[in-house]
Amino acid sequence: MQLQEIAQKLGCAYEGDPTLEIHSVASLAEARPGELSFLSEARYLPLLEQTQASAVIVEEGLALPCSIACLRGRDPRLLFAQAIELFYQPYRLPVGIHPTAVIDPSVELGEGVAIGPHAVVMEGVKIGDHTQIHPNVTIYPHVRIGSRCQLFANCVIHERTEIGDDCLIHSGAVIGDDGFGHIPLADGSWRRMLQAGRVVLEDNVEVGSNTTIDRAAVGETRIGRGTKIDNLVQIGHGVRTGSHCLIVAQVGIAGSTQLGHHVILAGQCGLAGHLHIGDGVRVAAQTGVTSDVPAGQTVAGYPHQPIAEWRKSMAVQRHLPELQRTLRKLEARVAKLEQNSTDRAPNAKMLEVGVDPETTCSS
């Protein structure tokens, strides 16, 4: 594809030979001749003098240290993401039902649906137009799946789950399994509580590999429109997220916690149950959230605190060994002063009553 053609498809300006041929995309460090790369920040400009890329995507108005063909736009990362789609398309199943798939006669399929080998689709399921069900997927009864969804290999969709349009469910994800509900009994054992609710994924939700989203005991576990969930995330029963949240790998959210819109949960953070997390909250990696967080805050640490306070705490923590040594020295000095004070006390008492301590000691 020629440089000018790429610029036209991306709707951006270009500089350099309009007939320059580009055949793929790559990072600046790994690019070879014929490949397109991008530069997201000015601090990476020195890499331009080392890269073998034939062209790069850069920000409008950014001065370059060397002569290289480029595409210019306001958001180089977005343009690069769009450029990837010009050269690469993910695998799609051929339309139709594979002979080894097991499909209940009551299932309703839209136009252009593809169902791969050994998939199982149980009674009462409805699948929208152009949705793809990849190999070994299991869909339990009375599930609703929208149009243009991708359910990748080995994921499991449990009964009564509702999935909107344009959703991606990656390999090994489990949607709608029982929530973790158990009641303590007098003898110290636990009684399992059936989970009669369901999970709802609104439109354009993405769920990563080996992530689990549990159904509610009653009511719904709901993932808001446009929310993106990474791999290995656990979302407990009754959780509700707003729209366009970002939940990174190994996050755990306990039951009935509610997230506002545009919340970001960084990797390995944990949220206790029955909390309310306001709109626009950002939670740093490995944070333990134990109480409600007001809208707009960025928090870190365990227990969580505003990130500015956490940074101050971390700055002090780095000096703890030095502070400990100083404290021990101070303790030793105080102990010595106290001992000296104790040694002088009897002599001071003798002077008060007119007795000479030296004479007393001599006799």
Swiss-Prot record:
InterPro entries membership: Hexapep, LpxD, Trimer_LpxA-like_sf, UDP_GlcNAc_AcTrfase_non-rep
Any one of the GO CC terms: carboxysome
Residue ranges of the region described as Disordered: 338-363
SUPFAM superfamilies, per the entry: Trimeric LpxA-like enzymes
EC number: 2.3.1.191
UniProt catalytic activity: a UDP-3-O-[(3R)-3-hydroxyacyl]-alpha-D-glucosamine + a (3R)-hydroxyacyl-[ACP] = a UDP-2-N,3-O-bis[(3R)-3-hydroxyacyl]-alpha-D-glucosamine + holo-[ACP] + H(+)
Keyword check for Glycoprotein: no
Enzyme superclass (EC): transferase
GO MF annotations in UniProt: N-acyltransferase activity; structural constituent of carboxysome shell
Keywords: Acyltransferase, Lipid A biosynthesis, Lipid biosynthesis, Lipid metabolism, Repeat, Transferase
Pathway: Bacterial outer membrane biogenesis; LPS lipid A biosynthesis
Keyword Protease: no
Family recorded in the similarity comment: Belongs to the transferase hexapeptide repeat family. LpxD subfamily.
Subunit and interaction comment: Homotrimer.
NCBIfam families: lipid_A_lpxD (TIGR01853), PRK00892.1 (NF002060)
Biological function: Catalyzes the N-acylation of UDP-3-O-acylglucosamine using 3-hydroxyacyl-ACP as the acyl donor. Is involved in the biosynthesis of lipid A, a phosphorylated glycolipid that anchors the lipopolysaccharide to the outer membrane of the cell.
Name of this chain's protein: UDP-3-O-acylglucosamine N-acyltransferase
